[in-house]
Amino acid sequence: MTTATDIAESQLKMPAQREPSVERRLLHRTLKPLFGTPVNAIVTLACLWILWLAAKGAYGWLVTRAVTEGGAQACKVGHGACWPYYEAKLRFMIFGVYPYDEHWRVALAMILFLGAIGITMIPRFWNRNLLVLWSMTIVGAAILIWGGVFGLSYVPTTQWSGLPLSFLLSAVGLAFGFPLGVILALARSSKLPAIRVIAIVFIEVIRGVPLISILFMASVMLPLFMPSGITVDKLLRAQIAIVIFAAAYIAEAVRGGLQAIPRGQHEASSAMGLHYWQAMRLVVLPQALKIAIPPLVNISIGFFQDTTLVTIIGLLDFLSTVRTAMTDPNWVGIAVMEGYVFAAVVFLVFSYGMGAYSRFLERRMRLGLD
């Protein structure tokens, strides 16, 4: 008869089973969805094969078969990427028809915008000083690009083009659209029927039509209603249309954040003696905006890409300058993919960077960090 002592001794004699290491557990967790079943394994291998073919073709086009020296004639007989095309047309694709000798001004303005965006992305700087920062950035960029003061030559808006124009339209549109969107979100959540109905109608009408329609109306229809002799700059009309369109979408994102705030926060604010605007400014809005940041980042990505629509009203945005560069008689039919590849890389870098930032914010909020 087996006793408890015999069982204990047999367990001591058994070799101890080693716990799998963290690396092995992580590897198993990663590979199981990919190769856990025969179907998953086949799909994974097929995708890897397609990626290998795409990477091999891209490497061959960019490196192995690329033309690195010579001009248009050398690229004409080549079968790969035409790097001399970038050397000849890169500045035009970026800056468009902006005066060549003044490119440093728009480059500096873009650096100002990128610096403001970088500071805005740091959570510890999320305070009212951001309003001052963006006001100074927009004024400084306008002085640099427009000129006419401090010894800078005046450059009309008809010569604003390329990547700086796309960047300006999206950055200014979001900078002015954000406070307007917050006001619309608060108005839509208001208990006053008249204000709530006006906000609802405005938001739903703007969100119910495509951006291209609003741009067309701002460019073509609006001048018809202006008094005789009064004209509004085409770029300004497009910018106002983008601000209005952005505000409607931002309002819905902020309203979602407001609805996620527990009712107890409002009641606690009232118990502390705070009136409506104090409660919103000090208690409710800071929490709602943190919740709404990921969708707001997605809206920013979409609006940067949607700036390509301004070409329909005659503005020379980044994608338009890329296309225009291809019409140079010296390069027609020679460099076809190079311009679009460059534009795709620029949009991809921006979109991926903003998407990664959105995921970072989501992880931060899950951890409950401020």
Language model segments and positions:
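Transmembrane alpha-helices and adjacent helix-loop boundaries
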Residues: T2-D370
